Swiss-Prot record:
Signal peptide from the UniProt entry: 1-29
The protein's name: Lipoprotein LpqB
Domain of life (superkingdom): Bacteria
Pfam families xrefs: Germane (PF10646), Gmad1 (PF10647)
Name of encoding gene: lpqB
GO cellular component, one term: plasma membrane
Organism: Corynebacterium jeikeium (strain K411)
Membrane topology: Lipid-anchor
Compartments where located: Cell membrane
SUPFAM superfamilies: DPP6 N-terminal domain-like
Record lipid sites (N-palmitoyl cysteine): C30
Residues carrying lipid (S-diacylglycerol cysteine): C30
Keywords associated with the record: Cell membrane, Lipoprotein, Membrane, Palmitate, Signal
Family: Belongs to the LpqB lipoprotein family.
InterPro entries given in the database record: 6-blade_b-propeller_TolB-like, GerMN, Lipoprotein_LpqB, Lipoprotein_LpqB_C
Length: 583
């Protein structure tokens, strides 16, 4: 791989290869990002605009079509929404606050409100809000009705909007061509992994790199602030340019107090953020006029920071739980695992991403459930006991795991990798009060690969929370955000994909499996051909999706464009089993 063409390692995106799926887009875009501020300042997002075309009023245009073009032009935020303001009367152009709340609608329906005349007409605009766009391109998923009026006036023979609500309304379809989701990466609190912070960026800007770096130095979105580190000091600045060879160059000032380790971690942030958004390296990085780190005087490649690769996949053979036993795929057959896992009835199990440590829920029938933890060849250690336990889930590595007891008590299990001794710490779940409904029961709780978030199913609905760290080192759930509006209360299983999206299995025969982005901006139904709901378990290794439906353990090859049906996993034929991959 040449320096000039170095790119980030990319995992296979489920939604890009499933040509047979029905895309149900909750597509969204970014909030208004300043286009005319100095790119050297922390608060800046991009240099001058690229001049991407937006619709303009045409001579003699009918009022309803002009209103529709206004909404399309509203998707172009440059110069204080100059493109959209061309559709307003002169007086309204100065009064409309285009920095007001921005709402994304699933559709925009327009109908006249009473009889109009040659000089005035009022239209009623309706739709469903699928999300709002916050500062820095943060998408906040919602699903509420929207309805309001837009008044129009004929000015010198041309229709213009004379009165409208103080809000920016966008049709989701406009985002397909004008906005793209990008990941800004921040280190976890221990500096061992990069955590994605998904943002929506307007594409009509000259420098994607400048936009990304400005968002990075501005810091993580509010929801992530207690789950990640922000290495850039408040008074620091960053300037983005291209060097003489056309390669990206990022020059920081104000980093004198950062340690060598922190500078290397910041370099990883920048390189993987740019590489993940198709800004090709190599990358020149400097801090206060000197190389970012003393040991790196040349340009940076992703290979130089491979230990922080946010897309790395843990390759392990498929395992499965069936009839209380744990099996491992071994060539053309499934082999029952021996050791302590074979000495009790295993209801569910999780495999750590490293070191092959198992966390298993044991017990059956009316007996209490017991969590047991240990490597395959070791003696296990007993931990949480309750009437019911969710399938356990590991964090970033084998030093911490999580389980939910009796649908409500979330416990973090800490494990000493040397001695194998475990401890238990209660996770503060007081933010669950923000979830609607009574008798809230957590049936699924799965921690992301970077350890910073968890997806959970509460009474059939899908939520994402951050795992915040408190001052005393314990964990606390961040505010739950419902991301699965498309599946309603039909969800029965969920797990993380390698690209950071969430796979969801449901009890709906017409839509048994979904892929949902972590910010709730996009939901996509995956083909259900040859599946029978409910889908009680889901997992993916990037090349195959595994699910347990009403009949068997099934697989779908996402790397093959010829795949049209789910097939039974050959090694587990005749057994109804749940898939197990490394967390």
């Amino acid at each position: 791989m040449s320096n000039k063409t170095t790119e980030a390692t990319k995992t296979t995106k489920v939604k890009k290869v499933l040509s047979v799926v029905a895309g149900l887009g909750l597509l969204a875009g970014c909030s208004t990002l300043p286009d005319d501020t100095n790119p050297e300042a922390i608060s800046s997002y991009a240099p001058a605009p690229s001049g991407q075309e937006a619709p303009t009023p045409t001579d003699g245009q009918p009022s309803d079509l002009l209103l529709r073009d206004f909404f399309t032009a509203s998707a172009h935020p440059l110069r204080d929404h100059q493109a959209a303001k061309k559709f307003l009367t002169g007086g309204m152009q100065g009064r409309w606050q285009s920095d007001a709340p921005t709402m994304v609608l699933d559709r925009i329906d327009i109908s006249s409100e009473g009889p109009g005349n040659d000089s005035k007409i009022t239209y009623r605009v309706r739709g469903n809000i699928v999300g709002t766009l916050g500062v820095g391109g943060v998408f906040d998923p919602q699903y509420t009705a929207f309805e309001t009026s837009y008044e129009m006036q004929n000015v010198d023979g041309q229709w213009r909007i004379s009165n409208l609500p103080n809000v920016v309304v966008l049709d989701r379809q406009d985002f397909v061509s004008t906005y793209r989701a990008r990941n800004i990466y921040f280190p976890d609190l221990n500096g061992r992994a990069l955590v994605s912070d998904r943002r929506w960026i307007y594409t009509g800007q000259q420098s994607t790199a400048a936009s990304l770096v400005s968002l990075l130095v501005a810091g993580p979105q509010d929801r992530l602030k207690k789950a990640v580190r922000n290495l850039v000091p408040e008074d620091a600045t960053a300037q983005v340019s291209n060097d003489g060879g056309g390669d990206p160059a990022v020059h920081f000032t104000g980093l004198q107090e950062l340690s060598a380790d922190a500078r290397r971690l910041l370099a990883a942030q920048v390189v993987w953020t740019l590489a993940g958004s198709e800004v090709r390296g190599p990358y020149e990085l400097t801090a206060d006029g000197t190389p970012m780190t003393d040991d790196m005087h040349g340009k940076w490649l992703v290979q130089d920071l491979s230990q922080y690769d946010p897309n790395v996949q843990v390759q392990t053979p498929l395992r499965a739980v069936s009839g209380g036993d744990v099996y491992q795929q071994d060539g053309a057959r499934a082999k029952k695992l021996e050791g302590w896992l074979s000495q009790q009835y295993v209801e569910s199990v999780a495999l750590s991403p490293r070191d092959e440590v198992y966390a298993a829920v044991t017990g059956r029938g009316d007996a209490p459930r017991q969590l047991m933890i240990g490597a395959k060849g070791d003696q296990p250690v007993s931990s949480v006991q309750a009437n019911s336990l969710t399938r356990p889930t590991w964090g970033l590595d084998a030093t911490s795991a999580y389980v939910v007891a009796d649908g409500e008590r979330i416990t973090e299990i800490t494990r000493n990798p040397e001695s194998g001794i475990v401890g238990e710490r209660k996770v503060d779940s007081s933010t669950m009060a923000m979830v609607d409904g009574k008798d809230k029961r957590i049936s699924v709780f799965r921690v992301s690969h970077d350890g910073a978030r968890a997806v959970m199913i509460v009474n059939g609905r899908v939520y994402v929370v951050t795992l915040d760290t408190t001052d005393d080192g314990t964990k606390r759930l961040g505010a739950p955000v419902e991301i699965g509006h498309a599946v309603g209360d039909t969800a029965v299983s969920a797990d993380w994909s390698d690209d950071g999206s969430v796979l969801v299995g449901t009890r709906a025969n017409d839509a048994p499996v979904w892929d949902i982005e972590v910010d709730g901006s996009y939901s996509q139904q995956i083909t259900g051909r040859n599946l029978s709901a409910p889908v009680v378990s889901v997992a993916t290794d990037g090349s195959k999706i595994y699910v347990t439906d009403a009949n068997a353990l099934m697989q779908f090859d996402v790397t093959s464009e010829e795949s049209r049906f789910w097939r039974e996993v050959p090694t587990m034929q005749g057994k109804r089993a749940t898939p197990v991959l490394a967390d």
